[in-house]
Amino acid sequence: MEREDWDRRYGGTELIWTAEPNRFVVEELGDLPAGRALDLGAGEGRNAVWLAERGWRVTAVDFSPVALDKARRLARARGVSVDWALEDLRDYQPEQAAYDLVLAAYLHLLPAGRAAVLGGAVAALARCGTLLVVGHDLANLTEGVGGPQDPAVLYTSKAIVAELDGLTVRRAGRVRRPVDTVAETGGAVDTLVLATRD
């Protein structure tokens, strides 16, 4: 989806997702010592705000000004500071070797765009830094509910790992999470890849 599509989707007064962070973000990153974090495709800011509440110095990037307005409101309501950046990630060049954590959660781009973003994410990691990539898995089309219906933008752990040259993969595979919304009830199948720069 393009910026205008996301602006329309984020246009209501309520958050599309909850204000609570993604469960895999909490499970995988909750024990990391705070440092400098980069949230790529931050949307309404739930993960960035959660990280900031835990002492991280967060830069959160998204291309939807509507989403970032909601994210700023969420951060104010929670009493935390986040550096919000309005950028199209397909063109964004993060500071290199600068972040202890880079997060890309549910950032679904066509393969060339995804490769560019993940290349930038890898370059942005400092020594001993952690990268977490989580998003809808290709298997979600047949085994799960929700998420994009275009196979070209869905993840597999193999495809994500192939973009992480120079990192040590700590975990890569499919994970399941419950989905219970007005529109859908069931489970979603996601890809989760956790990698570090040694």
How would you label these PLM feature ranges?
Residues 78-89:
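Conserved SAM-binding strand-loop segment of SAM-dependent methyltransferases
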Residues 92-101:
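A short acidic, Gly/Pro-enriched loop at the edge of an enzyme's catalytic core
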Residues 100-114:
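A short SAM/SAH-binding and catalytic strip from SAM-dependent methyltransferases
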